[in-house]
C-alpha cells in the first residue's frame, strides 16, 4: 500500500480519537497542487511557441512558467502553516501529558490520591504512543511531499525548505518535546504494558531505545528497519552526559549548570533568568533562554539508568551552588556597605 493511502486511512481513524482536533498535513491537497504544476509543464513542452492563444485559455491553477510562482506560493505557504500548527499542537499535548506523569506541588498530592483508586499508567502510555505516531506520520508526509516537489521541479527547494523548518524550530523530528516523549516512553517501561488495545494498525512509530553506556550516549527512535533518528545526550559544553537538562528555544540541550554558566547567571537563579541578549553557545541565537524547557522525563531516565553518575553530578552541582551563593551574598554585602 502506498503512503498516500496509508495516510488517508490514518486520518480516517483519527476522526473520533484523541487527536481529532489536531492539525494534519493536507497531503492529498498538496499533491494536487504539484500535479497541476506537472500538467502545466507537460503542456509547455508539447507547445513551446505556437500556441500562445491556447495558453491564454488555460486554467489559472496550472503552473505556466519555470519559476512556478503560483505553485510555490500555494505549496510552501500552506506547508509552513500546517507544520507550525502541528508543532504547536504536538508540544502542547506532550506538555499536558508529561505534567500528569511528573506532577509538582499540590497536583502531585492529588495525583497520588487518584492512583489509589485508578491506575492511569496504560492510558497515558497509549496517549504517548498516539502522539508519537501523530508526529511521525506528519513528519513522513512532509518529507515525502518535499521530495516529490524537488522531483517535479528538478530543484533543491524542498531540501532548502527542510533547512528553513529547522531554523524556524518547526522541524517535527528535531523537537525537544519528542525527546521528552521518548524518555517518557522508556520510563514507563511500555514494552511490559498491553499495547494492543486502541492503537493504529498503520502505525509508523516502532520503538525508542537509549544507550548511556557508550562514549557517545544516544537516544534512538526507530521508524522502520531502515529509517532511524539519533538524538545526542551529550552536553555541548561539558562534553559529558546531560544532567538536569534544559532545552533552549532553539532546540539545543544543555546541563542546567552549563546553560547558566553560558548565560552568565548563577545556577540558583535558573536558566530563565538569563538576560535577553544571551546567546545559545551552539547556534548563537539570542532570546532563547526565556522559554527554556526543563527536560524532567529525560533527567528521570538518566537518573534511573546511570544512578552513580547522576548522584556524582548532583553532589558537584550542589557544591557549586553553595559556592556561587556565598559569592553572590558576599558581593551583595559589599555593595550594601559601599565597599
Swiss-Prot record:
Single biological process term from Gene Ontology: protein ubiquitination
InterPro entries: BAH1, SPX_dom, Znf-RING_euk, Znf_RING, Znf_RING/FYVE/PHD, Znf_RING_CS
Domain SPX, first and last residues per copy: 1-163
Catalytic activity from the UniProt record: S-ubiquitinyl-[E2 ubiquitin-conjugating enzyme]-L-cysteine + [acceptor protein]-L-lysine = [E2 ubiquitin-conjugating enzyme]-L-cysteine + N(6)-ubiquitinyl-[acceptor protein]-L-lysine
Pathway: Protein modification; protein ubiquitination
UniProt GO MF annotations: transferase activity; zinc ion binding
The EC number(s) this enzyme carries: 2.3.2.27
The organism's place on the tree of life at top rank: Eukaryota
UniProt keyword list: Metal-binding, Transferase, Ubl conjugation pathway, Zinc, Zinc-finger
ZnF (RING-type) ranges: 235-284
Record comment regarding domains: The RING-type zinc finger domain mediates binding to an E2 ubiquitin-conjugating enzyme.
Family according to the record: Belongs to the RING-type zinc finger family.
Record-given protein name: Probable E3 ubiquitin-protein ligase BAH1-like 1
Natural source organism: Oryza sativa subsp. indica
The organism's taxonomic lineage, starting at the top: Eukaryota, Viridiplantae, Streptophyta, Embryophyta, Tracheophyta
